[in-house]
C-alpha cells in the first residue's frame, strides 16, 4: 500500500501497471517519472519550480502535450480521454504495456545532438551541442503530440488512432513517425555543424 491506495487503484487508467516498465536508456532514467498517480493531474504545481517537471508522471506530461494548442487548449479531460483511447489501441495492436511502448518511443524520438548559433564578430556560426536529458524528453513528447495532431488534421482517423500509430512507430524507430523523422533531421544538421 502506497500513499493510502491499493496497488489496483494505482494502475494507469485502471489497467496498466507502471512498475513493470523498463527504461533502457540510463541517461533518461531520472527524467522519466513512472511513479503512478490516482489521477494524472497535479494542477500545475511544478510550473514555477526549477526541474520539478521531471517528477511529473510521464503519462500526465503526454496528456499536457496533447492539450497544447488550438481547439484543445485547456481541455484536459478531452486530452485524458484521447490518451486513454490511444493506450487501448496500442495494447490491442502490440500486446504490450502501453506505458512501456511510450517510454521506448520517448527514448527513440529524443534528439541527442542539436545546433546553436554562436556569433563571432557579427557572423552567426552554427555549432553542434549535446542535448540535455530533460530537453530530450520534452522534445520527444512535443513531437509525438505534434505528429499525431498533423496526422489527424483533415483526416477521417481520430486523433487517438493517430496518436497510437505515432507512438508505436516511434517505439519501433520507424522514419514514418513524425517525431523520429524530426529527430533524424536535427541530428543530421548537427552532424554537419560539428
From Swiss-Prot:
InterPro entries: Ribosomal_uS7, Ribosomal_uS7_arc, Ribosomal_uS7_CS, Ribosomal_uS7_dom, Ribosomal_uS7_dom_sf, Ribosomal_uS7_euk/arc. It comes from the Archaea. GO terms for cellular component: small ribosomal subunit. GO terms for biological process: translation. GO terms for molecular function: rRNA binding; structural constituent of ribosome. Keywords: Ribonucleoprotein, Ribosomal protein, RNA-binding, rRNA-binding. NCBIfam families: PRK04027.1, uS7_euk_arch. One of the primary rRNA binding proteins, it binds directly to 16S rRNA where it nucleates assembly of the head domain of the 30S subunit. Is located at the subunit interface close to the decoding center. Belongs to the universal ribosomal protein uS7 family. Part of the 30S ribosomal subunit. This is Small ribosomal subunit protein uS7. It comes from Archaeoglobus fulgidus (strain ATCC 49558 / DSM 4304 / JCM 9628 / NBRC 100126 / VC-16).
Amino acid at each position: 500500500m502506497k500513499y493510502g491506495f491499493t496497488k489496483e487503484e494505482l494502475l494507469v487508467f485502471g489497467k496498466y501497471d507502471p512498475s513493470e516498465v523498463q527504461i533502457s536508456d540510463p541517461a533518461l532514467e531520472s527524467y522519466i517519472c513512472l511513479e503512478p498517480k490516482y489521477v494524472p493531474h497535479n494542477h500545475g504545481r511544478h510550473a514555477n519550480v526549477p526541474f520539478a517537471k521531471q517528477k511529473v508522471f510521464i503519462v500526465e506530461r503526454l496528456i499536457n502535450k496533447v492539450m497544447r494548442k488550438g481547439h484543445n487548449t485547456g481541455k484536459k479531460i478531452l486530452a485524458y480521454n484521447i490518451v486513454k483511447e490511444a493506450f487501448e489501441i496500442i495494447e490491442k495492436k502490440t500486446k504490450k504495456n502501453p506505458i512501456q511502448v511510450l517510454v521506448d518511443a520517448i527514448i527513440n524520438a529524443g534528439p541527442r545532438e542539436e545546433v546553436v548559433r554562436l556569433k563571432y564578430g557579427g557572423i552567426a556560426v552554427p555549432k553542434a551541442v549535446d542535448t540535455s536529458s530533460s530537453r530530450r524528453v520534452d522534445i520527444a513528447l512535443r513531437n509525438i503530440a505534434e505528429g499525431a495532431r498533423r496526422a489527424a488534421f483533415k483526416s477521417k482517423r481520430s486523433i487517438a488512432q493517430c496518436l497510437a500509430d505515432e507512438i508505436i512507430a516511434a517505439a519501433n524507430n520507424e522514419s514514418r513517425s513524425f517525431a523520429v523523422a524530426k529527430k533524424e533531421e536535427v541530428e543530421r544538421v548537427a552532424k554537419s555543424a560539428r
